[in-house]
């Protein structure tokens, strides 16, 4: 009985045996002896009585296992068995399940810390999440990663009951992740500084006897208005002017000569009259104290009696002294008025001079700074808007193709039935090299070249895995990943004598990403292995005669 098309023999038309069960087909079914059926993307399964919930797993945890000893095979859950370079993640709140809940269907990496612990690190929406892996999960990840890339991807609900599958992150997965990052809106704080450059990449690829060496140098410079030093200089000038205005106001309020009071004046005539009256009254009072200054009356008996009236000469003397005092008071009032007015005028003149100097130096200079800074801001913004686009990219590509003689020997494969496999036809190397040269020298004039940033810039591709055996089925993909900036735009189907019906990715980056994905989807180039991006639930069954290409280079 044939064992199936396990040797990738195109002459054997037998399906691959059914796969072991996923945990979603075993959970909750133990002890009842029924078969488990599934029509998921990994093909039909009609299998055994599950080992979950059995006597060997009755404790429902592994804390009772002896440390350092291997786990009993009966205790292995289905998720610990790798299948098609991947395994299923259960909803068991373990490290990988926790990471999957945080980052979803995204790429994560595995790192080893100094203390020997292994952590899985993923990122989503700018938030990085890390979990400490158990030894069994780390061993499972290593078992599906023979190349040691330490990069894996959650491929969504491809397992049973919506469980996520873990596979090695292929190059197209990293490219898809970069596309998603480019399509996500950027924050305002992520603008790049002026003069930033993105590097120089060189990649050598050998394919079917032809060596194709491509060197691509890309220089990208970005600038923003906030990174322009002239803008900050203008804003600093405006700020200096505002500070000058405030300082000038404070100085004028505190340090200048205060406003003088109105001068106090006295009426000279009123002062003279008041002084004259006061002097007359005072002298008259003093004169009455001396009886000799009064007139006397002689009575009938001849006695002299004071009459109470001052003598005429005394009155005249008093009047003369009063007038002199009034005149002196008048002159004094005139002098006092003149001095008060002079003092007021001097203080007012000094204050006006200080105000003139401070206003001219303070307000004038500050206003000039504010005006100049405002003009500088306006001119800088206008020049920045005029010099758009902000991002300027210069790309220089040099391609050199050299040929060498390769002798292809057909392989004789003998299947289990005893049939003899006929030698495969040899490809013409000249036609292949001509095809590569013609497609690599083609340029398309599309708007997507200058406006779409290349998402494949940081993806390193190696098509010829040293750990994967090479067959003569001509299943190699041409010109994939020649440079760091390849966006494939041409699809070429292989010759009819090959067993791989998938499409070839050829050409120069020109036609954009969406058209390439659409053409790949229509040509079936994405339907290999586990269903790919567009494959249905029966894709693995329909391609049983066309086995997937060796290795994990598939679209996930």
Curated annotation (Swiss-Prot):
Record PTM text: Phosphorylated by host kinases.
One Gene Ontology CC term in the entry: host cell plasma membrane
Ranges annotated as biased composition (Polar residues): 402-422, 536-546
Segments crossing the lipid bilayer: 231-251, 363-383
Keywords: Host cell membrane, Host membrane, Membrane, Phosphoprotein, Receptor, Secreted, Transmembrane, Transmembrane helix, Virulence
Alphabetical list of Pfam families matching this protein: Tir_receptor_C, Tir_receptor_M, Tir_receptor_N
Annotated segments matching region Disordered: 1-44, 182-226, 257-280, 388-449, 531-556
Membrane topology per record: Multi-pass membrane protein
Biased composition annotated in UniProt, kind: Basic and acidic residues: 182-205
Residues spanned by motif Essential for actin pedestal formation: 454-456
Compositional bias (Low complexity): 213-224, 257-277, 434-448
Positions in the Cytoplasmic compartment: 1-230, 384-556
Compartments it resides in: Secreted; Host cell membrane
Extracellular topological segments: 252-362
Described purpose of this protein according to its UniProt entry: Multifunctional protein that is required for efficient pedestal formation in host epithelial cells during infection. The extracellular region acts as a receptor for bacterial intimin, allowing the bacterium to attach tightly to the host-cell surface. Simultaneously, the intracellular region initiates a signaling cascade in the host cell, which leads to actin polymerization and formation of actin pedestals at the sites of bacterial adhesion.
Known partners and oligomeric status: Interacts with intimin and host proteins.
NCBIfam families with a match to the protein in the record: transloc_TIR
Family: Belongs to the Tir receptor family.
Protein name: Translocated intimin receptor Tir
Species in which this protein is naturally found: Escherichia coli O55:H7 (strain CB9615 / EPEC)
Lineage per the UniProt record: Bacteria, Pseudomonadati, Pseudomonadota, Gammaproteobacteria, Enterobacterales
Gene that this polypeptide is encoded by: tir
